[in-house]
Amino acid sequence: MWILFAFGSALFAGLTSILAKCGIKNTDSNTATAIRTIIVLIFSWIMVFLVGAQHGIGSVSAKTWTFLILSGLATGASWLCYFRALQIGDVDKVVPVDKSSAILSILLAFLFLHESISPLKLLCVVLIGAGTYLMITKKETSSENSRKKGWSWFFYALGSAVFASLTSILGKVGIENIDSNLGTAIRTIVVLIMAWIVVFVTKKQDSVRTIDHRELGFICLSGLATGASWLCYYRALQDGLASVVVPIDKLSILVTILFSYLVFHEKLGKKEAGGLVLIVAGTLGMLV
């Protein structure tokens, strides 16, 4: 059953990137992140009360609270980096870098969770890494805005990947003795606080009143998709292996690439398509 939750997470995560890109064309990415986190928080707590998990708050240990808070901080940092990268870069470049967090997650799972790395899994790591390289070194045929920003999108995307890998490991430790829905909801509170602190520190709070209604709609929809992805992901992570759940979640790249072509007309050349095949092959190889 946890496999199905993992694939559900991938589907919703793929839609999140497209919806978010549509919502941050003219809206500050940090402000958008803070707004959409409100949607995720509401969604998360609705699920908590639906399953009756709210009664477990009193039994959460100090250790679990610590790791949930740390996981929330890592998630917040990952989101802020990711949506900034999406705003200034092309979807079909940013997403592969973000999805490469699977590589670091596998290594961290080996070091801290004692999950084994077989020769096949090591080969899959190489395939994912090679595929990511091929996809991000595509010819510069993208948007004028992306060209003006150069490679700044890459460093934001890389930061997103690093923090995302830390999120998966810290989340795995933090949800061992807590309902997955409750764990997600608690982490989201941390993300929300962090996101709004960034908005006020950068003095972008006044921009909330001037956001285009259409973009605001897409931002909210991306929040709903994220909430659904999170709940599926951490439910799968609680029962399954982090080194398997994380790669399946990264299959969201297929959904994202498809819609980036349909919505933003971002086309893949032969080299980039080959890179995508390598990423998918490496991801599916993790399931063997």
Regions found by a protein language model. Name each.
Residues 1-12, 20-68, 79-89, 137-156, ...:
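Membrane-interface interhelical linkers
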Residues 44-55, 105-118, 161-176, 225-239, ...:
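Hydrophobic alpha-helical transmembrane segments in multi-pass integral membrane proteins
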Residues 30-31, 92, 118-120, 181-182, ...:
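Residues that define the loop-to-transmembrane-helix transition and helix capping
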Residues 39-43, 97-111, 190-194, 248-262, ...:
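Alpha-helical transmembrane segments of compact multi-pass small-molecule transporters, enriched
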Residues 8, 35-36, 70, 97-100, ...:
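Hydrophobic core positions of alpha-helical segments in small-molecule transporters
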